[in-house]
From Swiss-Prot:
The chain crosses the membrane at residues 19-39, 43-63. Coiled coil: none annotated. This is Apoptosis inducing factor BLCAP. One of its GO terms (cellular component) is nucleus. It is found in: Cytoplasm; Nucleus; Membrane. The gene is BLCAP. Interacts with RB1 (phosphorylated and unphosphorylated). Interacts with STAT3; the interaction is promoted by cell stimulation with IL6 and phosphorylation of STAT3.
Amino acid sequence: MYCLQWLLPVLLIPKPLNPALWFSHSMFMGFYLLSFLLERKPCTICALVFLAALFLICYSCWGNCFLYHCTGSHLPESAHDPRIVGT
């Protein structure tokens, strides 16, 4: 389970508030995970545990899934403030 210490922190990286950055963030995370899986070749158990955690986070639709934005989840109120997000 040594390889999980490199995979689990990826789930804690927050998604940006600005919707314009969601695509680039998801592409970066996808390429990072793909390159990690190809280079490090984690054991089967670690890969299954990580994929199960990723599936549960994305299935729960709490807004932390980096693959897509759930339509039912709402953005924080600060996301609509132009002073914080910028133009």
